[in-house]
């Protein structure tokens, strides 16, 4: 289930190890084997061909014997009977598929924070290829000079670098008092913050965005301390695993919906595995 990164890696590896077995992939979107980590650099103009983020096409996988169905969404998993329910998004046809082993690699989606007027034009996320194409187009317009980024995690800071590479005025607004606070100690984040400011990024820490302002299209970001002019607002407030189609009473998850796996990628359900943004990771230090 899912053919972006982890799913296609698993499919390709399994087919190499067991060439006589059927490997079937259902992907909700229309592309597979996509490296989303390249999005900020594509948006920033570090390279121009979006195909550089695609490792292999569906046709290449099919030639290798992997059966791929794009624009097909898995809507339910019956773990007891080892069946998945799939909807063809082109025809709305619903079908059932049985499995012997199941890999869940449904990824994650960008979190949309509960901010007033979040649906104004030029307010974007950066998670999918469509997001990247949209933001790249907006960034290429001369009139879009001021970029506000809400969130100072990996995506937020990489988006800041991309915008600066485009010659934009960049403001990063972070709820916490440090960038990447959940990832690095203060010694490291102090260096990151210094680097950001030296490169002209307006870094606003310990501020809460309360409202977006604009007449159809965003023009300002309002925080608990000030208003900032913005032609584009990038939402970089984290991601949520795409596991809503699963019954949490049947498969173990943590609070945010990520599927719990062991160091072999096994879930709490026999013959079911998970990997990628929809799953937890196993710590090499704690072995949990």
Which sequence ranges carry the predicted segments?
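Active-site substrate-recognition segment that forms the wall
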Residues: 28, 154-175, 258, 266-286
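FAD-site-proximal beta/loop scaffold in flavoenzymes
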Residues: 119-143, 216-220, 227-288
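A Rossmann-like FAD-binding core segment of flavoenzymes
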Residues: 20-22, 64-90, 97, 165-263
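Glycine-rich dinucleotide-binding loop and its adjacent helix/turn
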Residues: 104-166, 202, 255, 261-263
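Beta1-alpha1 glycine-rich phosphate/pyrophosphate-binding loop at the start
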Residues: 1-71, 160-184
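N-terminal Rossmann-like NAD(P) cofactor-binding module of classical short-chain dehydrogenase/reductase
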Residues: 103-104, 234
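Residue-level detector of alpha-helix initiation sites
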Residues: 4-8, 30, 108-110, 130, ...
């Amino acid at each position: 289930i899912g053919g972006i990164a982890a799913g296609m890696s698993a499919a390709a590896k399994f087919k190499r190890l067991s060439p006589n077995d059927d490997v079937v992939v259902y992907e909700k979107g229309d592309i597979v084997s996509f490296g989303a980590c390249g999005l900020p650099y594509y948006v920033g103009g570090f390279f121009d061909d979006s195909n550089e983020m695609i490792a292999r096409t569906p046709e290449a996988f099919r030639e290798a014997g992997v059966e791929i169905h794009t624009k097909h969404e898995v809507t339910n998993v019956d773990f007891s009977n080892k069946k998945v329910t799939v909807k063809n998004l082109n025809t709305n046809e619903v079908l059932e598929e049985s499995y012997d082993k199941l890999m869940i690699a449904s990824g994650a989606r960008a979190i949309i924070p509960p901010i007033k007027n979040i649906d104004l034009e030029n307010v974007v996320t950066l998670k999918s290829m469509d997001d990247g194409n949209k933001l790249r187009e907006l960034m290429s317009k001369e009139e879009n000079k001021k970029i506000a980024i809400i969130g100072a995690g990996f995506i937020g800071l990489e988006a800041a670098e991309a915008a600066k590479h485009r010659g934009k005025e960049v403001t990063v607004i972070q709820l916490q008092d440090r960038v990447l606070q959940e990832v690095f100690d203060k010694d490291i984040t102090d260096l990151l913050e210094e680097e950001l400011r030296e490169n002209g990024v307006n870094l606003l820490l310990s501020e809460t965005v309360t409202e977006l302002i604009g007449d159809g299209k965003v023009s300002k970001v309002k925080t608990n301390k000030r208003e900032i002019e913005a032609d584009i607002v990038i939402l970089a407030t984290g991601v949520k695993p795409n596991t809503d189609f699963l019954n949490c009473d049947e498969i173990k998850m943590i609070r945010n919906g990520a599927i719990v796996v062991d160091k072999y990628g096994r879930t709490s359900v026999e013959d079911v595995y998970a990997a990628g943004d929809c799953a937890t990771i196993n710590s090499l230090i704690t072995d949990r």
